[in-house]
Amino acid sequence: MGMSAISTETLSLGYGDAVIIDELNLTIPKGEITVFIGSNGCGKSTLLRSLARLMKPRGGSVLLEGRAIAKLPTKEVAKELAILPQGPSAPEGLTVHQLVKQGRYPYQNWLKQWSKEDEEAVERALKATKLEDMADRAVDSLSGGQRQRAWIAMTLAQETDIILLDEPTTYLDMTHQIEILDLLFELNEKEDRTIVMVLHDLNLACRYAHHLVAIKDKRIYAEGRPEEVITCDLVQNVFSMNCQVTQDPLFGTPLCIPHGRGRCIVQEAAFTSHG
């Protein structure tokens, strides 16, 4: 593993009396796509929020390129790291252009108002997300995929090297899921952005991630390249699900086929669990 964009040292998180993450040590590789996986309630989203300083740790620390993030000025953090939470909502009537402009907040102060540089950053973000022709449309009039692209455009206008996204494909149909993940993959591939995501679809996580982090029992259960990490045993232990793990015929990445009930149109189906 190369340089780290973000890391944690004995990080502990919780709500009230509940411990969600316990003394977790994590390294997010710089310039790669990292995906958190795990069962519902395992702490994936909580961990992601803490990496963006949206949640105060009970113990330990989060380091942004080696610096304690808790000690950094808010605008300095916002120039280096952007986060898109799950299911964000925009005020009624807000246009795509107005939303994307919000990404320039870290660069504004009473001395420096809106500039040509800011407008150019917004235009680049709209172009990258293919929203130039929709800039004057209200965000709430867009389809689910278009709306999610508008929010991603806002994070792009922020011009950070690190982007965190909490379940960016939730509530999207298959076409729009691939559209969003392809966009993020392209940002990583062409601009070397560090992308950190929470995803529920294990097969899409395996396709797009360079680095997979499986979380269970408040800690990291396994991490590494998907092809090194994903086994039937891991899926059983992390998700309590029996499955067959094979190879994606298009991409060569791990493909998880869950056991269970359903129509069977092959003469013989061997539902055996093995690692």
Curated annotation (Swiss-Prot):
Domain ABC transporter: 6-242
Signal peptide (residue range): none
Free-text disruption phenotype from the record: Strains lacking this gene show a reduction in growth stimulation by the iron-hydroxamate siderophores schizokinen and arthrobactin compared to wild-type. They also show a reduction in growth stimulation by the catecholate siderophores enterobactin and bacillibactin.
UniProt xrefs under InterPro entries: AAA+_ATPase (IPR003593), ABC_transporter-like_ATP-bd (IPR003439), ABC_transporter-like_CS (IPR017871), P-loop_NTPase (IPR027417), Siderophore_ABC-ATPase (IPR051535)
Predominant location: membrane
Tree of life domain: Bacteria
Subcellular location: Cell membrane
Any one GO CC term of the record: plasma membrane
Positions annotated to bind ATP: G38, S39, N40, G41, C42, G43, K44, S45
Membrane topology value: Peripheral membrane protein
Keyword Transport: yes
Biological processes, Gene Ontology terms: iron ion transport
Family the entry assigns: Belongs to the ABC transporter superfamily.
Subunit organization: The iron-hydroxamate siderophore complex is composed of one ATP-binding protein (YusV), two transmembrane proteins (YfiZ and YfhA) and a solute-binding protein (YfiY); the catechoplate siderophore complex is composed of one ATP-binding protein (YusV), two transmembrane proteins (FeuB and FeuC) and a solute-binding protein (FeuA).
Annotated protein name in UniProt: Probable siderophore transport system ATP-binding protein YusV
UniProt source species: Bacillus subtilis (strain 168)
Gene: yusV
